[in-house]
Amino acid sequence: MSWVIVTGANGGIGAATVHELIKNNYSVYAADLADKPHESFAAYGDAIFRYRSVNVSDEESVRALARAAAEVGEPIQGAVLAAGIVHSKPLLDTSFEDWKRLHAVNADGVFLCLREFARAMIEQIQTSPENTRSLVTVASNAARVPRAEFGAYGASKASAVRVSSSFGLQLSRHGIRVNTVCPGTTRTPMVTDAWNGEDLSALSVAGSPETFRLGIPLGRIADPADIAAVNAFLISDASRHITMQNIVADGGATF
């Protein structure tokens, strides 16, 4: 059974991705900052699920994860990089510490994970002409358009998009594909926490002309499962001729 690494596995999109991959007969090496895995993973045995506490912004922590995943026995099929943090504040009010913290996780973490996972995969198999190995970065539609309150966040995600496509170009000769997924507003704990107890989904759907933000033409915010399905597709052989692409899954919010 093929193994896929999932970072940010305890988060909304990360957890949904773990479940979607296991449903599609992948084994998952899950990682998150927390000491213990999400309670919804309790039924999964060691044959299909492993967990490790990892700080994606720490080079040695990421390297140790790559080593551990490589030692499971089966080759690493790919990875979904779903670890991320959000920050909502105008740029004029954003501290340099906040800026660095966002980039440490959302940009540096993506670079470290892509580099270390790719190194481990190449060490296992130098090249795979079938192009079945895949790395997927979960970014954000804020990487594509300016957001009044998400300037620093969008910049960190834009960095993740660009470094992912650059890795995709360099790893193509090894038969490893690299793509990014850009969700829009998704009902995850990270998003609902940022709403401070209010349900702002209707506002997201309607848009905000005063902040030059379009609404969502499909009429709803995303569920984590919506994004997980895209992640699983990009991991699967069905996408073996897709690389260096940025797949936007935001209900049309950035058309």
Feature locations, PLM:
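Active-site helix of classical SDR
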Residues: 114, 156, 164
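Alpha-helical segment proximal to the catalytic Tyr-Lys
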Residues: 119, 169-170, 240
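Substrate-binding pocket helix/loop in short-chain dehydrogenase/reductase
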Residues: 90-91, 98-100, 212
